[in-house]
Amino acid sequence: MSADLNSDLFNNLRLELRRGLLIVAVLAQLRREHYGYTLRKDLAALGIEIDEGTLYPLLRRLETQGLLESEWREENNRRKRFYKLSRAGRAILKQLLAELEQINSSLTRIIQPNE
């Protein structure tokens, strides 16, 4: 397998892995209210980079699914859309975190079978 093909394959698999985890990360961060820029900045500070072109469609989708609530407010003479978890979002996040913990535990046993 050529280096370019190997690199492309890795990048595609990495993106696939990150997609689901980004949802969990965004939901978890939105236990506390954020607007898009601060959400992106806080996630980046925690090691999770997310492009604007990925974040804003994700926020809209999660809101459409009833997992987020949002409202427009003026802050420092600028209108900003603030997002936070809805009650349904909190319930789903709790379930997703339990599922993630189970998957992590299983993967640890698979990857490190003798420990």
Regions found by a protein language model. Give the residues of each.
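Short, Lys/Arg-enriched N-terminal segment that forms or immediately precedes the first helix
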Residues: 1-15
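N-terminal helix-turn-helix DNA-binding core of bacterial DNA-binding proteins
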Residues: 14-54
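Short, charged/polar surface micro-motifs in flexible loops or helix N-caps
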Residues: 32-35, 64-65, 89
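Alpha-helical residues within the helix-turn-helix
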Residues: 41, 63-64
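Short, hydrophobic-biased segments on the C-terminal half of alpha helices
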Residues: 56-61
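Beta-hairpin "wing" of winged helix-turn-helix
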Residues: 65-79, 84
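Basic, amphipathic "hinge/linker" alpha-helix immediately C-terminal to the N-terminal HTH DNA-binding motif
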Residues: 79-97
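Amphipathic alpha-helical dimerization/coiled-coil segments
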Residues: 91-115
